């Protein structure tokens, strides 16, 4: 489409695609727009964190959980971009990833800080961490 997102030509539904070193991830939803991202669990995103991570959220995360929180936040920003397109501001100031208890799978509270009037909807973020890959799906509800 005009925002660079993949579309299903002549078909019903929404798709999103991600890839990283030897892996690919495809999400399909019949009814709701989706965005996905995946990264290797051992990827160090701390150097880039200052560009995409809200400092107040990071400070609320225990030190032992910060690496996975930073990776989840990175994946959430990437997935949101694939879902929404240009949010009209910076991720650091406008994407909120609330601290969460990490495990092998679960949900994460993700929100866009009111700057995308065309995307004033509920977002649901689900993740899987298989020990090698961290995969995150954001769906508009």
Question: What name fits each language-model region?
Answer:
Residues 1-141:
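Core catalytic alpha/beta fold that binds nucleotide/phospho-ligands
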């Amino acid at each position: 489409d005009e925002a660079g997102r993949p579309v299903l030509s002549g078909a019903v539904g929404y798709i999103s695609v991600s890839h990283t070193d030897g892996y690919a991830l495809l999400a399909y939803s019949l009814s709701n727009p989706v965005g996905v991202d995946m990264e290797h669990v051992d990827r160090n995103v701390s150097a880039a964190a200052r560009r995409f991570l809200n400092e107040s959220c990071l400070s609320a995360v225990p030190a032992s959980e910060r690496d996975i929180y930073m990776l989840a936040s990175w994946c959430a920003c990437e997935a949101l971009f694939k879902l929404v397109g240009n949010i009209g501001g910076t991720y650091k100031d406008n994407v909120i990833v609330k601290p969460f208890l990490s495990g092998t799978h679960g949900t994460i509270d993700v929100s866009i800080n009111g700057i995308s009037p065309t995307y004033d909807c509920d977002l649901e973020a689900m993740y899987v961490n298989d020990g090698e890959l961290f995969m995150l799906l954001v769906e508009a509800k």
